[in-house]
Amino acid sequence: MKRAVIFSLLDKDGYADGYVLELLRAMKEQADLLVLVCRGALHEGTRAAVEEAVDRVVINKDAEAHNYAKALSEVGEIKGMDEAVFLSSVFFGPVYPLAEMFAEMEAHGDLDFWTLTPHGFSDRYPYPYEPLPDISEQSHMSFVAFRKGLMGSGKFTQFWDILTKPGRESDEASVANGELLDDITGYFAQIGYRGGSYITPSGGDDLNPFHMLHMPKTLFEKYRCPLFDIRAFTTPKHRILENTFGEPAGDFLRALESLGEYDVGLIWEWLIRAAHPCDFVNALGLVHILPTSTQIPEADPIERNGLKVALFMHLYYMDLLGDSLAYAQNVPASMDIFVTTSSEEKARSIEAAFAALPNKVEVRLVENRGRNESAMLVGLADIAKSYDFICYYHDKKTDLIEPASIGRSNAYKLQLCTLPSHVFALNTIDIFLKNPLLGFLTPTEPNHAYYSKTPGNEWASDFENTLRLHGELGLTAPIAEDRYPVASYGSVFWFRCAALKRLFEKGWRYEDFPEEPVSQDESLLHAIERIYPYVCQSEGYIPAYLMSDRAAELEILNLRESLRQVNLFAKKNGVVETLGALLSHFDYQLFRGQKALEKIDGAGDLSAGAFLKAKVKAGFRGKGEK
Protein backbone atom coordinates (compact mmCIF):
# COMPACT_ATOMS: atom_id res chain seq x y z
CA MET A 1 0.00 0.00 0.00
CA LYS A 2 1.45 3.37 -1.04
CA ARG A 3 1.12 5.80 1.83
CA ALA A 4 1.48 9.55 2.28
CA VAL A 5 1.72 11.25 5.66
CA ILE A 6 0.79 14.91 6.13
CA PHE A 7 2.25 16.15 9.40
CA SER A 8 0.85 19.41 10.79
CA LEU A 9 3.38 21.23 12.97
CA LEU A 10 1.42 23.36 15.41
CA ASP A 11 4.09 25.27 17.30
CA LYS A 12 3.47 28.99 16.79
CA ASP A 13 7.17 29.64 16.15
CA GLY A 14 7.61 26.67 13.83
CA TYR A 15 9.86 24.94 16.35
CA ALA A 16 10.15 21.15 16.08
CA ASP A 17 10.90 19.63 19.49
CA GLY A 18 12.82 16.40 19.87
CA TYR A 19 9.64 14.37 20.23
CA VAL A 20 8.42 15.77 16.87
CA LEU A 21 11.65 14.84 15.09
CA GLU A 22 11.53 11.35 16.61
CA LEU A 23 8.00 10.85 15.29
CA LEU A 24 8.86 12.23 11.85
CA ARG A 25 11.77 9.82 11.48
CA ALA A 26 9.59 6.88 12.48
CA MET A 27 6.81 7.93 10.09
CA LYS A 28 9.32 8.30 7.26
CA GLU A 29 9.99 4.55 7.48
CA GLN A 30 6.28 3.84 6.90
CA ALA A 31 5.58 6.48 4.25
CA ASP A 32 6.30 6.79 0.55
CA LEU A 33 5.78 10.53 0.92
CA LEU A 34 6.15 12.57 4.11
CA VAL A 35 4.96 16.18 3.95
CA LEU A 36 5.29 18.61 6.85
CA VAL A 37 3.08 21.68 6.81
CA CYS A 38 3.67 24.62 9.12
CA ARG A 39 1.95 27.95 9.60
CA GLY A 40 4.70 30.41 8.86
CA ALA A 41 8.40 29.74 8.55
CA LEU A 42 10.18 26.92 10.32
CA HIS A 43 12.27 27.94 13.32
CA GLU A 44 15.91 28.35 12.32
CA GLY A 45 16.99 26.30 15.31
CA THR A 46 15.31 23.14 14.00
CA ARG A 47 14.75 23.86 10.28
CA ALA A 48 17.69 21.76 9.06
CA ALA A 49 16.63 18.75 11.15
CA VAL A 50 13.05 18.98 9.86
CA GLU A 51 14.10 19.27 6.22
CA GLU A 52 16.32 16.22 6.61
CA ALA A 53 13.50 14.18 8.17
CA VAL A 54 10.75 14.86 5.58
CA ASP A 55 10.28 14.84 1.80
CA ARG A 56 8.48 18.16 1.47
CA VAL A 57 7.87 21.24 3.60
CA VAL A 58 4.76 23.31 2.91
CA ILE A 59 4.32 26.76 4.42
CA ASN A 60 0.76 27.84 5.19
CA LYS A 61 0.17 31.57 5.62
CA ASP A 62 -3.49 31.24 6.60
CA ALA A 63 -4.99 29.92 9.83
CA GLU A 64 -3.66 26.69 11.31
CA ALA A 65 -6.85 24.80 10.52
CA HIS A 66 -5.88 25.23 6.85
CA ASN A 67 -2.64 23.28 7.24
CA TYR A 68 -3.93 20.02 5.78
CA ALA A 69 -5.84 21.76 2.99
CA LYS A 70 -2.69 23.66 2.03
CA ALA A 71 -0.70 20.44 1.77
CA LEU A 72 -3.42 18.80 -0.35
CA SER A 73 -3.49 21.74 -2.74
CA GLU A 74 0.29 22.01 -3.15
CA VAL A 75 1.27 18.34 -3.23
CA GLY A 76 -0.87 16.70 -5.90
CA GLU A 77 0.66 13.24 -5.39
CA ILE A 78 -1.13 12.85 -2.05
CA LYS A 79 -4.56 12.03 -3.51
CA GLY A 80 -2.97 9.45 -5.79
CA MET A 81 -1.75 7.40 -2.85
CA ASP A 82 -3.59 4.35 -1.54
CA GLU A 83 -3.73 5.98 1.88
CA ALA A 84 -2.98 9.40 3.36
CA VAL A 85 -2.42 9.81 7.09
CA PHE A 86 -3.26 13.23 8.50
CA LEU A 87 -1.27 13.63 11.72
CA SER A 88 -0.46 16.59 13.96
CA SER A 89 2.21 17.39 16.50
CA VAL A 90 -0.12 16.82 19.42
CA PHE A 91 1.12 13.23 19.19
CA PHE A 92 4.38 11.76 20.43
CA GLY A 93 5.83 8.31 19.92
CA PRO A 94 6.07 5.69 18.66
CA VAL A 95 6.23 3.70 21.88
CA TYR A 96 5.55 0.52 19.89
CA PRO A 97 6.55 -0.13 16.25
CA LEU A 98 4.32 1.73 13.80
CA ALA A 99 4.63 -1.24 11.46
CA GLU A 100 2.29 -3.20 13.77
CA MET A 101 -0.47 -0.63 13.40
CA PHE A 102 -0.15 -0.14 9.65
CA ALA A 103 0.05 -3.90 8.96
CA GLU A 104 -3.13 -4.55 10.92
CA MET A 105 -5.06 -1.73 9.29
CA GLU A 106 -3.97 -2.75 5.79
CA ALA A 107 -5.88 -5.99 6.41
CA HIS A 108 -9.09 -3.93 6.62
CA GLY A 109 -9.26 -2.99 2.98
CA ASP A 110 -13.01 -2.31 3.18
CA LEU A 111 -12.48 0.88 5.20
CA ASP A 112 -12.68 4.35 3.71
CA PHE A 113 -10.94 5.94 6.69
CA TRP A 114 -9.64 4.96 10.10
CA THR A 115 -8.47 6.61 13.30
CA LEU A 116 -6.14 5.65 16.11
CA THR A 117 -8.84 5.41 18.78
CA PRO A 118 -12.62 5.92 18.59
CA HIS A 119 -13.76 9.52 18.33
CA GLY A 120 -14.99 10.35 21.80
CA PHE A 121 -16.45 13.82 22.36
CA SER A 122 -20.13 14.58 22.10
CA ASP A 123 -22.70 17.07 23.29
CA ARG A 124 -22.68 15.31 26.67
CA TYR A 125 -18.90 15.21 26.98
CA PRO A 126 -17.36 18.33 25.44
CA TYR A 127 -13.87 18.35 24.02
CA PRO A 128 -11.65 18.30 27.12
CA TYR A 129 -8.20 19.34 25.99
CA GLU A 130 -6.47 22.64 26.21
CA PRO A 131 -4.72 23.69 23.01
CA LEU A 132 -1.03 22.97 22.94
CA PRO A 133 1.05 25.64 24.65
CA ASP A 134 2.19 28.30 22.22
CA ILE A 135 -0.35 27.59 19.47
CA SER A 136 -3.49 29.51 18.68
CA GLU A 137 -6.72 28.94 20.59
CA GLN A 138 -8.39 26.24 18.55
CA SER A 139 -8.48 22.48 18.30
CA HIS A 140 -7.21 20.32 15.48
CA MET A 141 -7.68 16.99 13.78
CA SER A 142 -4.87 14.93 15.25
CA PHE A 143 -4.85 11.54 13.50
CA VAL A 144 -6.98 10.12 10.69
CA ALA A 145 -6.07 8.01 7.66
CA PHE A 146 -8.07 8.34 4.42
CA ARG A 147 -8.16 5.73 1.69
CA LYS A 148 -7.92 6.40 -2.04
CA GLY A 149 -11.62 5.91 -2.79
CA LEU A 150 -12.71 8.58 -0.33
CA MET A 151 -9.95 11.00 -1.29
CA GLY A 152 -11.04 10.82 -4.92
CA SER A 153 -14.67 11.60 -4.14
CA GLY A 154 -16.50 14.87 -4.65
CA LYS A 155 -17.49 14.94 -0.99
CA PHE A 156 -13.86 14.92 0.08
CA THR A 157 -13.05 17.80 -2.25
CA GLN A 158 -16.17 19.67 -1.12
CA PHE A 159 -15.16 19.37 2.53
CA TRP A 160 -11.82 21.07 1.98
CA ASP A 161 -13.33 23.64 -0.38
CA ILE A 162 -15.78 24.74 2.32
CA LEU A 163 -13.02 24.78 4.92
CA THR A 164 -10.87 27.11 2.82
CA LYS A 165 -13.46 29.22 1.05
CA PRO A 166 -12.87 33.02 1.08
CA GLY A 167 -13.59 34.59 4.45
CA ARG A 168 -12.28 31.64 6.47
CA GLU A 169 -8.62 32.63 6.47
CA SER A 170 -8.63 34.40 9.83
CA ASP A 171 -7.96 32.78 13.20
CA GLU A 172 -11.45 33.76 14.36
CA ALA A 173 -13.13 31.96 11.48
CA SER A 174 -10.67 29.13 11.92
CA VAL A 175 -12.11 28.28 15.32
CA ALA A 176 -15.14 26.98 13.46
CA ASN A 177 -12.86 25.27 10.97
CA GLY A 178 -11.02 23.58 13.80
CA GLU A 179 -14.28 22.12 15.06
CA LEU A 180 -15.05 20.85 11.57
CA LEU A 181 -11.71 19.10 11.52
CA ASP A 182 -12.25 17.63 14.97
CA ASP A 183 -15.31 15.72 13.78
CA ILE A 184 -14.33 15.10 10.18
CA THR A 185 -14.72 11.36 10.75
CA GLY A 186 -18.23 11.87 12.10
CA TYR A 187 -19.13 13.78 8.97
CA PHE A 188 -17.90 11.15 6.53
CA ALA A 189 -19.50 8.35 8.55
CA GLN A 190 -22.80 10.23 8.51
CA ILE A 191 -22.85 10.47 4.72
CA GLY A 192 -22.18 6.77 4.23
CA TYR A 193 -18.44 6.16 4.28
CA ARG A 194 -17.08 3.24 6.27
CA GLY A 195 -14.71 4.01 9.13
CA GLY A 196 -12.93 2.20 11.91
CA SER A 197 -10.23 2.59 14.52
CA TYR A 198 -6.99 0.75 15.17
CA ILE A 199 -7.84 0.41 18.85
CA THR A 200 -11.36 -0.39 19.98
CA PRO A 201 -11.43 -0.41 23.80
CA SER A 202 -13.79 -2.96 25.33
CA GLY A 203 -14.75 -4.52 28.64
CA GLY A 204 -15.66 -1.19 30.24
CA ASP A 205 -12.74 0.68 28.71
CA ASP A 206 -15.09 1.77 25.94
CA LEU A 207 -17.24 3.74 28.41
CA ASN A 208 -14.67 6.52 28.67
CA PRO A 209 -15.09 9.18 25.98
CA PHE A 210 -11.50 10.47 26.20
CA HIS A 211 -9.18 7.51 26.03
CA MET A 212 -6.01 9.50 25.40
CA LEU A 213 -6.65 11.82 28.33
CA HIS A 214 -8.19 9.54 30.93
CA MET A 215 -6.69 6.11 30.29
CA PRO A 216 -3.34 6.42 28.49
CA LYS A 217 -1.71 3.76 30.69
CA THR A 218 -4.42 1.27 29.70
CA LEU A 219 -3.99 2.08 26.02
CA PHE A 220 -0.25 1.59 26.45
CA GLU A 221 -0.21 -1.64 28.46
CA LYS A 222 -3.37 -3.41 27.28
CA TYR A 223 -3.82 -2.27 23.69
CA ARG A 224 -0.23 -1.49 22.57
CA CYS A 225 -1.19 1.95 21.31
CA PRO A 226 1.87 3.37 19.51
CA LEU A 227 1.07 7.11 19.68
CA PHE A 228 -0.18 9.33 22.50
CA ASP A 229 -1.50 12.85 22.88
CA ILE A 230 1.14 14.94 24.61
CA ARG A 231 -1.59 17.23 25.98
CA ALA A 232 -2.31 14.57 28.60
CA PHE A 233 0.70 16.02 30.46
CA THR A 234 -0.58 19.60 30.38
CA THR A 235 -4.38 19.45 30.52
CA PRO A 236 -5.48 21.48 33.59
CA LYS A 237 -6.15 19.40 36.67
CA HIS A 238 -9.80 20.37 37.01
CA ARG A 239 -10.54 18.80 33.63
CA ILE A 240 -8.76 15.60 34.60
CA LEU A 241 -10.74 15.44 37.84
CA GLU A 242 -14.03 15.52 35.95
CA ASN A 243 -13.62 11.81 35.17
CA THR A 244 -10.65 10.47 37.16
CA PHE A 245 -8.82 10.54 40.48
CA GLY A 246 -6.10 12.59 38.79
CA GLU A 247 -3.72 9.70 38.20
CA PRO A 248 -3.66 9.15 34.38
CA ALA A 249 -0.69 11.23 33.22
CA GLY A 250 1.65 10.45 36.11
CA ASP A 251 0.95 6.71 36.08
CA PHE A 252 1.36 6.60 32.31
CA LEU A 253 4.70 8.42 32.35
CA ARG A 254 6.04 6.07 35.02
CA ALA A 255 4.89 3.03 33.03
CA LEU A 256 6.47 4.42 29.88
CA GLU A 257 9.72 5.09 31.71
CA SER A 258 9.83 1.60 33.23
CA LEU A 259 9.48 -0.05 29.81
CA GLY A 260 12.48 1.90 28.57
CA GLU A 261 11.59 1.71 24.88
CA TYR A 262 10.85 5.41 24.50
CA ASP A 263 13.07 8.29 25.58
CA VAL A 264 10.86 10.14 28.08
CA GLY A 265 13.50 12.85 28.14
CA LEU A 266 11.92 14.08 24.90
CA ILE A 267 8.67 14.67 26.80
CA TRP A 268 10.45 16.55 29.57
CA GLU A 269 12.34 18.59 26.99
CA TRP A 270 9.06 19.80 25.50
CA LEU A 271 7.40 20.41 28.87
CA ILE A 272 10.31 22.53 30.07
CA ARG A 273 10.42 24.54 26.85
CA ALA A 274 6.75 25.07 26.13
CA ALA A 275 4.41 24.12 28.99
CA HIS A 276 3.11 26.15 31.91
CA PRO A 277 4.65 24.80 35.13
CA CYS A 278 1.39 24.54 37.05
CA ASP A 279 -0.11 22.38 34.28
CA PHE A 280 2.54 19.68 34.20
CA VAL A 281 3.20 19.81 37.94
CA ASN A 282 -0.49 19.11 38.54
CA ALA A 283 -1.02 16.60 35.73
CA LEU A 284 2.04 14.56 36.72
CA GLY A 285 1.56 14.92 40.47
CA LEU A 286 4.96 16.47 41.13
CA VAL A 287 4.74 16.55 44.91
CA HIS A 288 7.62 15.00 46.85
CA ILE A 289 6.37 13.81 50.24
CA LEU A 290 9.41 12.77 52.27
CA PRO A 291 9.72 11.04 55.65
CA THR A 292 10.97 12.96 58.66
CA SER A 293 12.24 9.95 60.63
CA THR A 294 13.23 7.31 58.05
CA GLN A 295 16.37 7.99 56.06
CA ILE A 296 15.99 6.97 52.41
CA PRO A 297 19.67 6.95 51.36
CA GLU A 298 21.91 4.49 53.20
CA ALA A 299 24.56 7.12 53.86
CA ASP A 300 24.79 10.89 53.94
CA PRO A 301 24.34 11.80 50.24
CA ILE A 302 26.23 15.06 50.78
CA GLU A 303 29.42 13.37 51.97
CA ARG A 304 29.01 10.36 49.68
CA ASN A 305 28.82 12.56 46.58
CA GLY A 306 31.21 15.29 47.67
CA LEU A 307 28.47 17.92 47.48
CA LYS A 308 28.43 21.43 48.82
CA VAL A 309 25.08 22.18 50.46
CA ALA A 310 24.13 25.19 52.56
CA LEU A 311 21.36 26.66 54.64
CA PHE A 312 20.81 30.37 53.93
CA MET A 313 18.90 32.16 56.69
CA HIS A 314 17.75 35.74 57.08
CA LEU A 315 16.89 36.51 60.71
CA TYR A 316 15.25 39.78 61.67
CA TYR A 317 13.09 39.03 64.72
CA MET A 318 15.22 38.29 67.76
CA ASP A 319 12.18 37.18 69.75
CA LEU A 320 11.96 34.30 67.24
CA LEU A 321 15.66 33.41 67.52
CA GLY A 322 14.88 30.26 69.50
CA ASP A 323 12.59 28.99 66.74
CA SER A 324 15.19 29.82 64.10
CA LEU A 325 17.89 27.98 66.06
CA ALA A 326 15.64 24.93 66.35
CA TYR A 327 15.21 25.02 62.57
CA ALA A 328 18.99 25.26 62.03
CA GLN A 329 19.61 22.36 64.41
CA ASN A 330 17.89 20.08 61.88
CA VAL A 331 20.69 20.70 59.40
CA PRO A 332 23.21 17.84 58.99
CA ALA A 333 26.76 18.65 60.05
CA SER A 334 27.81 18.28 56.41
CA MET A 335 25.85 21.45 55.50
CA ASP A 336 27.18 24.98 55.95
CA ILE A 337 25.05 27.74 57.45
CA PHE A 338 25.05 31.38 56.36
CA VAL A 339 22.93 33.85 58.32
CA THR A 340 22.13 37.43 57.34
CA THR A 341 20.76 40.05 59.69
CA SER A 342 20.37 43.82 59.89
CA SER A 343 22.45 45.01 62.89
CA GLU A 344 25.62 44.32 64.86
CA GLU A 345 23.60 43.63 67.98
CA LYS A 346 21.50 41.01 66.22
CA ALA A 347 24.61 39.47 64.70
CA ARG A 348 26.18 39.00 68.14
CA SER A 349 22.99 37.37 69.46
CA ILE A 350 22.88 34.99 66.50
CA GLU A 351 26.57 34.07 66.79
CA ALA A 352 26.12 33.28 70.47
CA ALA A 353 23.02 31.18 69.87
CA PHE A 354 24.53 29.24 66.94
CA ALA A 355 27.96 28.71 68.54
CA ALA A 356 27.15 25.19 69.71
CA LEU A 357 26.23 23.92 66.23
CA PRO A 358 28.73 21.52 64.62
CA ASN A 359 28.34 23.24 61.25
CA LYS A 360 30.43 25.94 59.67
CA VAL A 361 28.45 29.11 60.52
CA GLU A 362 28.95 32.58 59.07
CA VAL A 363 26.86 35.64 60.02
CA ARG A 364 26.70 38.59 57.63
CA LEU A 365 25.33 42.11 58.00
CA VAL A 366 22.96 43.27 55.27
CA GLU A 367 20.72 46.26 54.67
CA ASN A 368 17.08 45.78 55.57
CA ARG A 369 16.02 47.34 52.27
CA GLY A 370 14.51 44.46 50.34
CA ARG A 371 14.07 42.31 53.44
CA ASN A 372 14.78 38.59 52.96
CA GLU A 373 14.85 38.79 49.14
CA SER A 374 17.74 41.28 48.99
CA ALA A 375 19.47 39.47 51.85
CA MET A 376 19.85 36.44 49.61
CA LEU A 377 20.15 38.06 46.16
CA VAL A 378 22.59 40.78 47.27
CA GLY A 379 24.03 39.73 50.62
CA LEU A 380 24.70 36.08 49.71
CA ALA A 381 24.96 36.21 45.91
CA ASP A 382 28.74 35.89 45.92
CA ILE A 383 28.71 32.49 47.61
CA ALA A 384 25.56 30.95 46.13
CA LYS A 385 27.40 29.87 42.98
CA SER A 386 29.85 27.85 45.11
CA TYR A 387 27.13 25.44 46.27
CA ASP A 388 25.20 22.61 44.64
CA PHE A 389 22.01 22.88 46.69
CA ILE A 390 20.65 25.47 49.12
CA CYS A 391 17.79 25.55 51.59
CA TYR A 392 16.53 29.10 52.08
CA TYR A 393 14.72 30.20 55.23
CA HIS A 394 13.74 33.44 56.90
CA ASP A 395 11.89 34.08 60.13
CA LYS A 396 8.29 35.13 59.68
CA LYS A 397 5.94 37.23 61.75
CA THR A 398 2.57 38.35 60.40
CA ASP A 399 1.34 41.22 62.54
CA LEU A 400 -1.53 42.25 60.27
CA ILE A 401 -3.54 39.03 60.68
CA GLU A 402 -5.41 38.27 63.87
CA PRO A 403 -5.31 36.10 65.82
CA ALA A 404 -1.54 35.65 65.69
CA SER A 405 -1.93 31.87 65.55
CA ILE A 406 -2.91 32.15 61.87
CA GLY A 407 0.45 33.60 60.89
CA ARG A 408 2.35 31.32 63.25
CA SER A 409 0.69 28.29 61.70
CA ASN A 410 1.80 29.49 58.28
CA ALA A 411 5.39 29.73 59.53
CA TYR A 412 5.01 26.27 61.09
CA LYS A 413 3.87 24.82 57.77
CA LEU A 414 6.85 26.33 55.95
CA GLN A 415 9.22 24.82 58.50
CA LEU A 416 7.44 21.47 58.45
CA CYS A 417 7.67 21.29 54.66
CA THR A 418 11.33 22.26 54.29
CA LEU A 419 13.46 21.24 57.28
CA PRO A 420 11.56 19.40 60.03
CA SER A 421 14.46 17.04 60.79
CA HIS A 422 18.05 16.09 60.04
CA VAL A 423 16.79 13.03 58.15
CA PHE A 424 14.41 15.11 56.05
CA ALA A 425 17.29 17.28 54.83
CA LEU A 426 19.22 14.20 53.67
CA ASN A 427 16.11 12.81 51.99
CA THR A 428 15.63 16.10 50.15
CA ILE A 429 19.18 16.03 48.78
CA ASP A 430 18.59 12.42 47.75
CA ILE A 431 15.48 13.45 45.78
CA PHE A 432 17.48 16.12 43.95
CA LEU A 433 20.14 13.55 43.05
CA LYS A 434 17.60 11.01 41.82
CA ASN A 435 15.84 13.65 39.71
CA PRO A 436 18.52 15.56 37.76
CA LEU A 437 15.89 17.84 36.18
CA LEU A 438 14.54 18.91 39.57
CA GLY A 439 15.52 22.51 40.26
CA PHE A 440 13.15 24.08 42.78
CA LEU A 441 11.19 22.58 45.69
CA THR A 442 8.62 24.65 47.53
CA PRO A 443 5.84 24.03 50.05
CA THR A 444 2.30 24.30 48.74
CA GLU A 445 0.60 27.65 49.25
CA PRO A 446 -1.01 28.42 52.63
CA ASN A 447 -4.71 27.56 52.62
CA HIS A 448 -5.95 27.74 56.19
CA ALA A 449 -8.05 30.47 57.84
CA TYR A 450 -7.25 33.90 56.33
CA TYR A 451 -5.13 32.18 53.66
CA SER A 452 -7.98 30.02 52.36
CA LYS A 453 -8.49 32.62 49.62
CA THR A 454 -5.01 31.93 48.19
CA PRO A 455 -5.86 28.92 45.96
CA GLY A 456 -7.45 30.52 42.91
CA ASN A 457 -5.98 33.93 43.77
CA GLU A 458 -2.29 33.02 43.58
CA TRP A 459 -1.28 36.05 41.55
CA ALA A 460 -3.20 38.51 43.77
CA SER A 461 -2.31 41.87 42.16
CA ASP A 462 1.17 40.77 41.18
CA PHE A 463 0.93 39.34 37.68
CA GLU A 464 1.97 42.52 35.87
CA ASN A 465 5.01 43.21 38.04
CA THR A 466 6.05 39.54 37.81
CA LEU A 467 5.62 39.64 34.03
CA ARG A 468 7.80 42.74 33.92
CA LEU A 469 10.53 41.00 35.92
CA HIS A 470 10.16 37.93 33.67
CA GLY A 471 11.02 40.17 30.71
CA GLU A 472 13.89 41.94 32.47
CA LEU A 473 15.51 38.60 33.26
CA GLY A 474 15.05 37.37 29.69
CA LEU A 475 13.15 34.28 30.82
CA THR A 476 11.73 31.84 28.27
CA ALA A 477 9.38 29.78 30.46
CA PRO A 478 5.71 30.34 29.57
CA ILE A 479 3.85 32.68 31.90
CA ALA A 480 0.17 33.65 31.81
CA GLU A 481 -2.30 35.23 34.19
CA ASP A 482 -4.67 32.26 33.93
CA ARG A 483 -1.88 29.88 34.96
CA TYR A 484 -0.76 30.22 38.56
CA PRO A 485 2.91 30.15 39.58
CA VAL A 486 4.34 27.12 41.40
CA ALA A 487 5.73 29.67 43.79
CA SER A 488 6.93 29.76 47.37
CA TYR A 489 4.40 31.95 49.14
CA GLY A 490 6.57 32.92 52.07
CA SER A 491 9.95 32.45 50.35
CA VAL A 492 11.10 29.34 52.21
CA PHE A 493 12.31 26.63 49.82
CA TRP A 494 15.08 24.36 48.48
CA PHE A 495 16.80 24.86 45.15
CA ARG A 496 19.52 23.55 42.89
CA CYS A 497 21.88 26.49 42.49
CA ALA A 498 22.23 26.00 38.73
CA ALA A 499 18.44 26.38 38.42
CA LEU A 500 18.42 29.92 39.83
CA LYS A 501 21.72 30.97 38.28
CA ARG A 502 20.17 33.74 36.20
CA LEU A 503 18.59 35.36 39.23
CA PHE A 504 21.84 35.47 41.19
CA GLU A 505 23.83 36.73 38.21
CA LYS A 506 21.56 39.72 37.59
CA GLY A 507 23.75 41.94 39.73
CA TRP A 508 21.12 43.15 42.21
CA ARG A 509 21.77 46.19 44.38
CA TYR A 510 19.94 47.23 47.52
CA GLU A 511 18.81 50.33 45.63
CA ASP A 512 16.79 48.06 43.32
CA PHE A 513 14.48 47.17 46.20
CA PRO A 514 11.71 49.29 47.73
CA GLU A 515 12.31 51.20 50.94
CA GLU A 516 10.24 50.54 54.04
CA PRO A 517 7.36 50.50 54.54
CA VAL A 518 6.75 47.98 51.74
CA SER A 519 3.23 47.68 50.34
CA GLN A 520 1.29 44.50 51.02
CA ASP A 521 1.11 43.76 47.29
CA GLU A 522 2.41 44.78 43.86
CA SER A 523 6.03 45.26 44.97
CA LEU A 524 9.26 43.86 43.54
CA LEU A 525 9.43 41.57 46.57
CA HIS A 526 6.13 39.97 45.61
CA ALA A 527 7.30 39.59 42.02
CA ILE A 528 10.51 37.85 43.10
CA GLU A 529 8.49 35.56 45.36
CA ARG A 530 6.59 34.37 42.27
CA ILE A 531 9.42 34.40 39.71
CA TYR A 532 11.53 31.55 41.11
CA PRO A 533 9.79 28.68 39.23
CA TYR A 534 10.03 30.57 35.93
CA VAL A 535 13.76 31.17 36.41
CA CYS A 536 14.14 27.49 37.23
CA GLN A 537 12.28 26.36 34.11
CA SER A 538 14.09 28.85 31.87
CA GLU A 539 17.37 27.29 33.01
CA GLY A 540 16.17 23.85 31.90
CA TYR A 541 14.88 22.50 35.21
CA ILE A 542 11.46 21.79 36.70
CA PRO A 543 9.78 23.13 39.86
CA ALA A 544 7.83 20.86 42.19
CA TYR A 545 6.20 20.82 45.59
CA LEU A 546 7.86 19.51 48.76
CA MET A 547 6.18 18.26 51.93
CA SER A 548 7.07 16.19 54.95
CA ASP A 549 4.93 13.19 55.83
CA ARG A 550 3.50 15.07 58.82
CA ALA A 551 2.68 18.13 56.71
CA ALA A 552 0.92 15.92 54.16
CA GLU A 553 -1.20 14.32 56.90
CA LEU A 554 -2.41 17.74 57.98
CA GLU A 555 -2.86 19.11 54.45
CA ILE A 556 -4.99 16.20 53.22
CA LEU A 557 -7.42 16.35 56.12
CA ASN A 558 -7.50 20.15 56.11
CA LEU A 559 -8.46 20.26 52.43
CA ARG A 560 -11.03 17.50 52.92
CA GLU A 561 -12.65 19.42 55.75
CA SER A 562 -12.63 22.62 53.71
CA LEU A 563 -14.48 20.89 50.86
CA ARG A 564 -16.85 19.27 53.35
CA GLN A 565 -17.76 22.67 54.80
CA VAL A 566 -18.43 24.01 51.30
CA ASN A 567 -20.74 21.05 50.64
CA LEU A 568 -22.52 21.53 53.97
CA PHE A 569 -23.07 25.18 53.15
CA ALA A 570 -24.43 24.21 49.73
CA LYS A 571 -26.73 21.61 51.29
CA LYS A 572 -28.03 24.07 53.86
CA ASN A 573 -28.80 26.60 51.13
CA GLY A 574 -30.37 24.13 48.72
CA VAL A 575 -27.70 24.36 46.03
CA VAL A 576 -25.88 21.09 46.60
CA GLU A 577 -26.87 19.71 43.18
CA THR A 578 -25.68 22.88 41.49
CA LEU A 579 -22.39 22.71 43.36
CA GLY A 580 -22.00 19.03 42.51
CA ALA A 581 -22.48 19.76 38.84
CA LEU A 582 -19.95 22.57 39.03
CA LEU A 583 -17.32 20.44 40.75
CA SER A 584 -17.74 17.47 38.39
CA HIS A 585 -18.07 19.34 35.08
CA PHE A 586 -16.26 22.66 35.50
CA ASP A 587 -16.14 23.55 31.84
CA TYR A 588 -19.35 22.06 30.48
CA GLN A 589 -20.99 25.43 29.86
CA LEU A 590 -17.73 26.80 28.52
CA PHE A 591 -17.36 24.22 25.75
CA ARG A 592 -15.59 26.46 23.33
CA GLY A 593 -16.67 24.58 20.22
CA GLN A 594 -20.40 24.93 20.76
CA LYS A 595 -20.79 28.48 19.48
CA ALA A 596 -18.25 27.90 16.76
CA LEU A 597 -20.31 25.00 15.47
CA GLU A 598 -23.47 27.08 15.57
CA LYS A 599 -21.81 29.61 13.27
CA ILE A 600 -21.44 27.03 10.52
CA ASP A 601 -24.80 25.31 10.92
CA GLY A 602 -26.49 24.99 7.57
CA ALA A 603 -23.29 25.29 5.50
CA GLY A 604 -24.17 22.88 2.70
CA ASP A 605 -23.99 19.28 3.85
CA LEU A 606 -21.89 20.25 6.87
CA SER A 607 -24.51 20.33 9.62
CA ALA A 608 -23.15 21.42 12.99
CA GLY A 609 -25.75 19.41 14.86
CA ALA A 610 -24.91 16.32 12.86
CA PHE A 611 -21.21 16.85 13.53
CA LEU A 612 -21.70 16.95 17.26
CA LYS A 613 -23.85 13.81 17.38
CA ALA A 614 -22.30 11.66 14.64
CA LYS A 615 -20.60 8.46 15.75
CA VAL A 616 -18.11 6.49 13.75
CA LYS A 617 -19.45 3.00 13.02
CA ALA A 618 -16.37 0.82 12.79
CA GLY A 619 -17.94 -2.08 10.91
CA PHE A 620 -15.26 -4.54 12.06
CA ARG A 621 -13.84 -5.91 15.26
CA GLY A 622 -10.94 -3.63 16.02
CA LYS A 623 -7.84 -4.20 18.11
CA GLY A 624 -8.79 -5.24 21.63
CA GLU A 625 -12.41 -6.08 20.81
CA LYS A 626 -13.52 -9.65 21.48
Q: Predicted segment positions?
A:
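ER/Golgi luminal nucleotide-sugar-dependent glycosyltransferases, focusing on the catalytic module
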Residues: 1-623
